[in-house]
């Protein structure tokens, strides 16, 4: 059955294109991908990202469990703040990229990918139920995806909008810090976070969902819809645009961010690791805390010794052409890899992409070729983000 977010009916009325994504019917664009993309880079946009997964861990042993099933050290951040961390399988391959919030009082909220939350929840509950070291833990694991509406407000004007709506300055919060706020009597969690490269915040509202898979929990999303429309109304003076998943993808790609299923993934069958991706290959070692034990650590240590074989690299087209997922990449006359994500940058009006290539080519400044429609087009490897960070993004100076 296709899944739907809380305010799907609003999107159905206002979006120009709705498509299935990771099992969800989601808005792809309202006006156009380019218009929405540029609104976020230059002003502010709002995304409904309620298809993202939420899993809650409660109990005295919640931290102990999470420390073992994720790669980063989530014991340090105080409540309420989050840690970017990875969940790996025993072979060191990435099951998902996640954000784990310490909510205080032995409770943790994990934000995970839209097409990974079900397998993660099943896996965590399997470990808790069957692995001896976990069976006696004081731990409750609850899937909350269908109960929480999640909206992302992104762009340089997001700071002003947060001040108007909530009376807070998000620039006084560190990245992934969160706090409880209210809007017109509706309580929600607000975090300084996002997936666009821009400044911004995300809100989490617990509410009824008319499309909840459990019919007994269905209801009208009055709180979520009110918050969504209120943000749009208050944001009019800043040029806010409702944005779909199309712009979200081009924005994350311009920022150089990885996407689960493209740059990070694991096989569903335990047969071979040819198509699996590890943090060392995906340039995500910053999310690994080596001074603890975690699932997949032994496999990663062995990979460090023997070499990773291939790595992710970002590239920008020199010749005219738009790279797409699956296109072959060449250097010095030999095939060295293939594109995992590619698009025409709405900001730069040039083709950009991410590719897996042989390890020796995974550094900036190397001329490569991308085979586009039967022709090899010149490109060069670069360091992300693709835009000038002094002019755009979280650390812009202008």
Swiss-Prot record:
GO terms for MF: aminomethyltransferase activity; transaminase activity
Listed EC numbers: 2.1.2.10
Annotated keywords: Aminotransferase, Transferase
Gene3D superfamilies associated with the record: Aminomethyltransferase beta-barrel domains, Aminomethyltransferase fragment, Probable tRNA modification gtpase trme, domain 1
Pfam families the UniProt entry points to: GCV_T, GCV_T_C
Sequence intervals crossing the membrane: none
GO CC aspect terms: glycine cleavage complex
GO biological process: glycine decarboxylation via glycine cleavage system
Catalytic activity: N(6)-[(R)-S(8)-aminomethyldihydrolipoyl]-L-lysyl-[protein] + (6S)-5,6,7,8-tetrahydrofolate = N(6)-[(R)-dihydrolipoyl]-L-lysyl-[protein] + (6R)-5,10-methylene-5,6,7,8-tetrahydrofolate + NH4(+)
Family: Belongs to the GcvT family.
Quaternary assembly: The glycine cleavage system is composed of four proteins: P, T, L and H.
Described purpose of this protein according to its UniProt entry: The glycine cleavage system catalyzes the degradation of glycine.
Protein's UniProt name: Probable aminomethyltransferase
This protein's encoding gene: gcvT
């Amino acid at each position: 059955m296709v899944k739907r977010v809380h305010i799907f009916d609003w999107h159905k009325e206002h979006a120009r294109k709705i498509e299935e994504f990771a099992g969800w019917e989601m808005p792809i664009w309202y006006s156009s991908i380019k218009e929405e993309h540029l609104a976020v880079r230059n002003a502010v946009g709002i995304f409904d990202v309620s298809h993202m997964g939420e899993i809650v861990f409660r109990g005295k042993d919640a931290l102990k469990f999470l420390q073992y099933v994720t790669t980063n050290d989530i014991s340090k951040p105080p409540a309420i703040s989050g840690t970017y961390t990875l969940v790996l399988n025993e072979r060191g391959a990435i099951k998902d990229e996640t954000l784990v919030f310490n909510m205080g009082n032995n409770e943790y909220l994990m934000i995970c990918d839209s097409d990974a939350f079900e397998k993660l929840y099943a896996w965590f509950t399997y470990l808790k139920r069957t692995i001896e070291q976990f069976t006696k833990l004081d731990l409750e694991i609850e899937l909350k995806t269908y109960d929480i509406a999640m909206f992302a407000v992104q762009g340089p004007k997001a700071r002003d909008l947060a001040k108007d709506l909530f009376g807070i300055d998000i620039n006084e919060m560190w990245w992934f810090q969160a706090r409880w706020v209210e809007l017109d009597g509706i309580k929600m969690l607000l975090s300084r976070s996002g997936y666009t490269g821009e400044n911004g915040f995300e809100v989490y509202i617990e509410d009824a969902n008319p499309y909840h898979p459990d019919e007994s929990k269905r209801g009208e999303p009055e709180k979520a819809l009110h918050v969504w429309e209120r943000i749009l109304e208050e944001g009019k003076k800043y040029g806010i645009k409702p944005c779909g998943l199309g712009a979200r993808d081009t924005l994350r790609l311009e920022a150089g961010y990885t996407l689960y299923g493209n740059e990070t993934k694991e096989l569903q069958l335990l047969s071979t690791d040819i198509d699996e991706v590890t943090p060392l290959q995906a340039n995500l070692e910053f999310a690994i805390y080596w001074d603890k034990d975690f699932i997949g650590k032994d496999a990663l240590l062995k990979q460090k010794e023997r070499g990773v074989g291939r790595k992710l690299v970002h590239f920008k087209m020199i010749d005219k052409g738009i790279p797409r997922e699956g296109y072959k990449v060449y250097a010095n006359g030999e095939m060295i890899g293939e594109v995992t994500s590619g698009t025409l940058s709405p900001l730069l009006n040039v083709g950009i992409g991410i590719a897996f290539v042989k390890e020796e080519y995974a550094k900036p400044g190397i001329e490569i070729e991308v085979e586009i429609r039967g022709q090899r087009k010149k490109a060069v490897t670069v360091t992300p983000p693709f835009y000038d960070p002094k002019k755009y993004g979280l650390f812009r100076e202008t």
